[in-house]
Design a protein with these regions (language model features):
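Hydrophobic helical membrane-anchoring modules
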Residues: 1-16, 156-158, 182-240
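Short, well-formed alpha-helical segments that are part of the catalytic scaffolds
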Residues: 4-8, 24-39
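Hydrophobic targeting segments
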Residues: 15-21, 30, 36-37, 43-47
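Short beta-strand/loop segment that forms part of the nucleotide-sugar
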Residues: 21, 42-51, 73-75, 103-105
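Acidic helix N-cap motif at the loop->helix transition within catalytic regions
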Residues: 28-32, 53-62
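Conserved donor nucleotide-binding strand/loop of the catalytic core
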Residues: 45, 56-95
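Acceptor/aglycone-binding surface of glycosyltransferases and processive sugar-polymer synthases
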Residues: 75-94, 111-186, 212-230, 234
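Short beta-strand-to-loop acidic/aromatic patch adjacent to the donor-nucleotide binding site
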Residues: 97-108
Length: 240
């Protein structure tokens, strides 16, 4: 696993890097995330996933400050993070990106880690990167659930990873062209890992900082979602 470094992404590479951010009812949290990323010179694909609050208004307001950096796509209804990411992946191809990153909209990821997850791609050591959260800092319920999902990802997809449910990942354009994401909901995290493994895409794991708040702890993969993912994995194993 790649440790922390002082690597800096060149401005030319920043201009060719697109950060996909799916957002659902994040009006109170998303603004500082996208402003910080835009200030760093990265491009941003925002997918408003049918939010019922003022998320879309916030996105449009920030877009006015960074019209050359921010691009907004919207679902009329909430379709889930998996389909929101599919929309983001389809949209980003229009801009001919060199690198693509995915982070969450709620501020649980440190934008300072963008350069760290990009470093293996720019250095040519990998075509995909998985951001790994610290298990010791993770709330116990999430720690247990994530550990179980790591085991299931290994059993059903044959891949050993330290954090199968992370929402912070990156890949090259060539890697994106090779994978096919069809998952709905949070299964996208495991499906992403399955796709890079099935397509022999070299990947690295990079440690990332995670900022836990009551709001971020309440989101993500819970027991009910985990059971749904398990049955989907079984179906893939038997019929794909």
């Amino acid at each position: 696993m790649t440790a922390k470094s002082e690597f800096k992404v060149s401005m030319e590479d920043r201009k060719q890097t697109y950060v996909i951010i799916p957002a659902y009812n994040e009006e109170t949290r998303v603004r500082p995330v996208i402003e910080a990323i835009a200030d760093m010179g990265f491009k941003i694909i925002l997918v408003n996933d049918g939010s019922s609050d003022g998320t879309l208004d916030v996105l449009k307001d920030v877009q006015m400050k960074y019209p050359e950096n921010i691009f907004i796509y919207s679902h009329i209804i909430n379709r889930g993070v998996g389909l929101a990411m599919q929309t983001g992946f389809e949209a980003v191809l229009k801009y001919n990106p060199k690198y693509i990153v995915n982070i969450d909209a709620d501020g649980q990821h440190s934008v300072d880690d963008l350069e760290r997850v990009l470093e293996p791609l720019i250095a040519g050591r990998a075509e995909a990167v998985i951001g790994v959260r610290s298990l010791k800092d993770m709330p116990k319920s999430k720690n247990f659930g994530n550990s179980v999902m790591n085991i299931l990802t290994h059993i059903f997809y044959g891949v050993n990873v330290s954090d199968s449910q992370t929402g912070f990942r990156a890949l090259t354009r060539s890697a994106l062209d090779k994978i096919s994401i069809n998952a709905q909901g949070y299964l996208i995290s495991s499906e992403f890992i399955r796709e890079i493994n099935d397509n022999n895409i070299p990947f690295e794991e990079v440690t990332i900082e995670t900022i836990y708040t009551p709001e971020t702890q309440a989101k993500g993969t819970n027991y009910k979602v985990g059971i749904k993912i398990l049955f989907t994995m079984i179906r893939h194993k038997l019929f794909d």
